[in-house]
């Protein structure tokens, strides 16, 4: 049942749909005119539309003709005509909305209309997809439509060089993943030359599977990190061994629902005995606490082949939603290292954050944002509040014929899977294709073994064989096929009855060695014949599949999010095809077990239901909906909180990145450096001169500090002589004298190096200092954020405290940038390179001005589903380095309690005022009966 907020958000929906229908009619009215155009005339439409736009016509005015041109180009190149509902979807995208379109309604084709229209501005359009394969596939297929209209397409893929990326971004429409676009934004803001930058702005983005990218992946930021000093800590391995000796419920407690562990007294004793320390509560031992908690969590909460897999000596996280391996993605706060230690693989060194941005704030950079998905309605409120995006449900082209059966609930998992296998076998026997959704790699392999015993041929699609994902999904609608997949896997590739003709045709073209990029003319010439043959074969098989009942989707467990369940169901019944879906559940499923399945258990108990008999009950259905709502609300709150804190950092990031961009684009820094010089001198005078005259000042200390800044050319005696005596010197007089001397020294420095070299030195120094100080500031802000929650104990709002202290730290950083810049400009030993003809070159070299981080050593960390971090190197290969130095450091730090706050021990236990010293031994602690805190 829709909430009040959901109903409010739907007010005006009818008016929007009427506007979209009007656009669709206007486009259809032009169809015959555009069909009559020759190919070169159709291509010339782009030139005409661009001319009209440059003369002041709006994109809204040009929409009917632009959309009609795309529809015609698609008919000619792909043999696919945009339905009216697809035209409506494209208009919704152009107007800056999320178009909610059911699976199979052709969202990839929908994007072409809005992308083409907005590319008329020549400002670049970005189409964001969920993985590299889809980016490459869509740019290849839809690129044929755009080429027919005289537009270019590009694709951003992991491992491309900066030159390749720059070329792809220069295209009219560029496809790629959210991670690649975000990392390029961060890299551009670490560039040392304008020529190193690859992106050309953020004008219009179309986000495919928008709920997956903007909701599911929005909890953790994109991070570029580089090696920090220090080695991987031996404590991870020590505590991994120790955790295996601890017993659950005896030495520690586990709360699976909250994902927390609590260490009990006997556990603390064992830790102290193992480590040979007297008291874990002593401040010197507090860094060990995070290692202990992480080791226990790695053992108790993270299961191999469910939460992660171990391949080639590396721990790889499995996406809880899709079952895919999240390439290199990492858990934060030392959890990933703890799992590596638990599994006996190499524990990698941690990294330091160099640049970071959340997906929310990256996508807010776009002047206009839009998206497509089949399941956005449940998150409509969050889309509106975070991104100012409305959700517009687009009608289906044909009425939905899928039958969604009621859930069947069994007492235990074995009984459930036995019935699942029976159901699959019956469907398989009559030729009906079956898609089975499981929640983990472990479950998919378990079901696969049961099906093999039953003699049912099938394909398994999970994190361990994701390389064949698209091929498996494309064939999942064929007669008699059985596909066991982790939930939502294969998203973005249509399951068409009889097989995906498009996919099969592209594969055939590739097999013939034809490419739309390398051999575009041969590709176009062969396409129609290949596609025609494949299409005819598929159509015949599709008729048989329809007679068998269409695609049957069988879910083996409810997901914690309603959207994921709906996505699985949505694989069936595309484009008016017949289909069926059903979920099989058991009382031991994670969702039922963790979120109050008491109602279901009591119902089973009362009715004495045999193990192999299912029940259908509204009570159980309500319990499931309630559990899902709890999880969704919790996850939404996490994302909201992440955004609140990142908004503070985002304002600072915009200021720093704006400064860097102006510098790279050639702003003259001479005036700014002079301002820096004035402000630094003012700061020094503030420290050494108070109210009144010079009689009370320490001139020696003042001169000593000035000499660390620049070569002072005036002596104390000369200044006093100029004034007459110390008593006649005031701050304004001193300021004039010192600034005059400093400017003379700067002018002398410039004359010795040459004006051109000095301007280049200013640019290099300012960039170098900004980058170094910004990197340190990110570390400090991470540290501040991790400890700021403790302020709540002093009745203070952590967010307000974070804003206040973050601003103070930013001001400190800006002061340090000014002071360090002036110090470097005066004191660096600089070598000016001369050109062969003797003309002065602007190239300067100085120690400390080289780029601090080699591209090859950087790591690229992307957002995960539960705050984990994806880490890759420059070539796109998996890395296992820690996300940031601050995470480890802050987890080991203990914040001092605020004045008046309740004091806490190392494990968070209360310490009374009379007892604020740490207990001397275990007996003393037991006597005090101190409780432990959950972590």
Curated annotation (Swiss-Prot):
Catalytic reactions of this protein: ATP + H2O + cellular proteinSide 1 = ADP + phosphate + cellular proteinSide 2
Annotated GO MF terms: ATP binding; protein-exporting ATPase activity
Family to which this protein belongs: Belongs to the SecA family.
Protein name: Protein translocase subunit SecA
Binding, ATP: 86, 104-108, 494
Chief place where the protein resides: membrane
GO CC terms of this entry: cell envelope Sec protein transport complex; cytosol; plasma membrane
Provenance organism: Leifsonia xyli subsp. xyli (strain CTCB07)
Compartment list: Cell membrane; Cytoplasm
Residue span of region Disordered: 879-935
Subunit structure: Monomer and homodimer. Part of the essential Sec protein translocation apparatus which comprises SecA, SecYEG and auxiliary proteins SecDF. Other proteins may also be involved.
Protein's membrane topology: Peripheral membrane protein
The protein's role, per its UniProt record: Part of the Sec protein translocase complex. Interacts with the SecYEG preprotein conducting channel. Has a central role in coupling the hydrolysis of ATP to the transfer of proteins into and across the cell membrane, serving as an ATP-driven molecular motor driving the stepwise translocation of polypeptide chains across the membrane.
Upper lineage: Bacteria, Bacillati, Actinomycetota, Actinomycetes, Micrococcales
